[in-house]
């Protein structure tokens, strides 16, 4: 009997890999181990569940059981993988030992919750999985005032979604502007204004210091001596790859699980994919690099070593009141910007020292120009 491909994790990366494998091979044995129900869903949709008034059940596209049947996999639901033995090519899960031919770590990431003072810290909510959405949905529905920690991609999307759902929202961000790791301040300012127009209180260059319980809700204090009285607090302060299993198995781990161009870790026959993987020194928690990684890894697992090649990729900021799209390098080592701003939005092009287009950002109605600029970017790079 052939030994199986074993995948730890049942998120987007894991299931995209399975779908890709099954397009060319319907028979090779695949086992999936997950500590949740294994339902198939699109995680980015979680940033918009409140304005759309969706329940956890409505986010699911296929139940775990239906997915397992449709894609011919053995799904080990609600199963905790305790350890990996790279030398023996085994994993231990719920006390049982399983042998693999190839092992894929698709363990995902978790939301970083900074260390705050106060007795309310344990009540800080996170929204990074269907399981977490199920756990916090009623608390969010019952809340009138919500504070979101972090004005990056997820935090900004979530704050606007909650505002569109009728909540009073405060967004606290340590940097001087929103999406600071993605674009300069002059581009994100209109997005900040769009948030404010929806009623979001945007508090920049400030950090949450303490979260304390009150008789009803919480008192949040910041480094700039602001105090907010809210019904709940959500952390969107970034994602941290889940690397504990890899670390305990003595795999090379830096920010994420370090992989080579074939997505293989420092151990033979063990690969990493998705939010947990560190590729060329970067953790790329976006759909397009995960899709491309899954396509390459599927070929490798089926016997054809395939190196991952990552082109320029488009990122969409899903803020419906002020949509943003960007690609290429838009945050570091920009020699000059060419910026056109009018009532339709912003079109900003980034150039290097050789006057080559290296990236762009378009906003609002200007997003219709994104694909033309994307083609130009790919032509010059």
Curated annotation (Swiss-Prot):
Annotated GO MF terms: oxidoreductase activity, acting on iron-sulfur proteins as donors, NAD or NADP as acceptor
InterPro entries tied to this protein: FAD-bd_OxRdtase, FAD/NAD-bd_sf, FAD/NAD-binding_dom, NO_rdtase_NorW, Rbx-bd
Pathway this chain belongs to: Nitrogen metabolism; nitric oxide reduction
Transmembrane segments: none
Catalysis: reaction(s): 2 reduced [nitric oxide reductase rubredoxin domain] + NAD(+) + H(+) = 2 oxidized [nitric oxide reductase rubredoxin domain] + NADH
Disulfide bonds: none
Cofactor(s) required, per the database record: FAD
GO CC field: cytoplasm
EC assignment: 1.18.1.-
Pfam families on file: Pyr_redox_2 (PF07992), Rbx_binding (PF18113)
Gene3D superfamilies, sorted: 3.30.390.120, FAD/NAD(P)-binding domain (3.50.50.60)
Keywords for the protein's UniProt record, in alphabetical order: Cytoplasm, FAD, Flavoprotein, NAD, Oxidoreductase
Localization annotation: Cytoplasm
Family from the record: Belongs to the FAD-dependent oxidoreductase family.
Its job: One of at least two accessory proteins for anaerobic nitric oxide (NO) reductase. Reduces the rubredoxin moiety of NO reductase.
Protein name: Nitric oxide reductase FlRd-NAD(+) reductase
Species in which this protein is naturally found: Aliivibrio fischeri (strain MJ11) (Vibrio fischeri)
Native organism taxonomy: Bacteria, Pseudomonadati, Pseudomonadota, Gammaproteobacteria, Vibrionales
Name of the gene: norW
């Amino acid at each position: 009997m052939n030994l199986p491909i074993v995948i730890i994790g049942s998120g987007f990366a894991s299931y995209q890999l399975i779908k890709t494998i099954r397009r060319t091979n319907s028979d090779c044995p695949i086992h999936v181990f997950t500590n949740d129900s294994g339902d198939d869903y699109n995680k980015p949709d979680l940033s918009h569940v409140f304005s759309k008034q969706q329940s956890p059940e409505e986010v699911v596209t296929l139940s775990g059981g239906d997915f397992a049947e449709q894609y011919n996999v053995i799904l080990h639901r609600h199963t905790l993988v305790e350890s990996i033995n790279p030398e023996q090519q085994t994993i231990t899960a719920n006390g049982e030992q399983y042998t693999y031919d190839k092992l894929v770590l698709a363990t995902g990431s978790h939301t970083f919750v900074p260390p705050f003072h106060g007795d309310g810290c344990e009540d800080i909510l996170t929204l990074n999985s269907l399981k977490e959405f199920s756990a916090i949905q009623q608390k969010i529905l019952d809340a009138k005032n919500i504070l979101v920690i972090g004005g990056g991609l997820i935090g900004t999307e979530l704050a606007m979604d909650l505002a569109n759902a009728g909540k009073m929202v405060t967004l606290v961000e340590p940097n001087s502007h929103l999406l600071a790791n993605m674009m300069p301040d002059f581009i994100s300012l209109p997005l900040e204004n769009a948030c404010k127009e929806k009623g979001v209180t945007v508090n920049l260059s400030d950090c949450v210091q303490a979260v304390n319980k009150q008789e009803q809700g919480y008192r949040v204090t910041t480094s700039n001596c602001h105090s907010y009285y809210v019904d709940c607090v959500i952390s969107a302060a970034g994602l941290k790859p889940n690397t504990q299993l890899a670390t305990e198995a003595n795999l090379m781990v830096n920010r994420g699980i370090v992989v080579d161009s074939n997505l293989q870790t420092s151990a033979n026959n063990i690969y990493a994919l998705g939010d947990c993987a560190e590729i060329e020194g970067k953790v790329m928690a976006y759909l397009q690099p995960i899709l491309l990684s899954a396509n390459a890894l599927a070929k490798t697992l089926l016997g054809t070593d395939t190196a991952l090649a990552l082109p320029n990729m488009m990122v969409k900021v899903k803020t419906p009141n002020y949509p943003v799209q960007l690609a290429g390098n838009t945050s570091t080592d920009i020699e000059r910007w060419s910026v056109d701003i009018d009532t339709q939005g912003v079109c900003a092009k980034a150039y290097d020292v050789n006057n080559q287009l290296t990236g762009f950002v378009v906003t609002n109605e200007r997003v219709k120009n994104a694909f033309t600029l994307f083609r130009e970017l790919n032509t010059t790079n």
